[in-house]
Each structure stands twice: as structure tokens, then as C-alpha cells.
């Protein structure tokens, strides 16, 4: 079954995608990992470089990812299931020293 979700981009993710919101179709079972893979295939290589930590191959050092208003680390991480009509929000992390 196909589900429809909406991704909301904040900060640099909005600039790199050129969108505030993006509707996406996914095959069930849909996870955050599958959703992020689809986004990195859809948008520029720069979008992927900013989203995914190159050493870890993981987006979590670079982004807070919310599903239905909850951060995925409080759920099942990248294996969190995404349901039809869910809103996923990508919030960039700022690191400094």
C-alpha cells in the first residue's frame, strides 16, 4: 500500500531543497530511514552531504528528525514507522566550538 506524508524543511534543508514543504509517496512499511533515502535521491548531492554525516552514514548528528511532533530518538530511531498523513520535520543541528 502507498502512503502519503509531508516533509517540512527548516533552515539549510529548506534552502537546499528549495521548498518549505514536500509531499512524498512511500511504500509500506515505511520507515524514517526509507524516507530519508528517498529525499537524498530526490534533492541535490549537497542536500545529502549536509543531511548525512559522511563518517557515520547517519543523519542524526546533523538533524533533529520529528515524526508526528516527536523526535525519533524517543521512538525507534531510523526504524520509526511512518504512517499515512504523518508530518516529518527536518531541523538542522548547529555545532560549534
Predicted regions: what they are:
Residues 1-96:
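Ubiquitin-like/PB1-type beta-grasp interaction modules and other compact soluble beta-rich domains
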Amino acid at each position: 500500500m502507498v502512503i502519503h506524508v509531508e516533509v517540512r524543511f527548516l533552515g539549510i534543508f529548506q534552502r537546499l531543497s528549495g521548498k518549505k514543504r514536500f509531499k512524498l509517496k512511500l511504500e509500506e512499511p515505511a520507515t524514517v530511514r526509507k524516507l530519508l533515502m528517498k529525499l537524498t535521491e530526490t534533492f541535490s548531492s549537497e542536500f545529502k552531504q549536509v543531511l548525512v554525516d559522511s563518517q557515520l552514514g547517519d543523519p542524526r548528528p546533523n538533524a533533529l528528525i520529528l515524526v508526528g511532533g516527536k523526535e525519533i530518538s524517543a521512538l525507534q530511531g531510523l526504524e520509526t514507522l511512518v504512517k499515512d498523513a504523518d508530518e516529518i520535520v527536518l531541523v538542522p543541528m548547529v555545532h560549534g566550538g
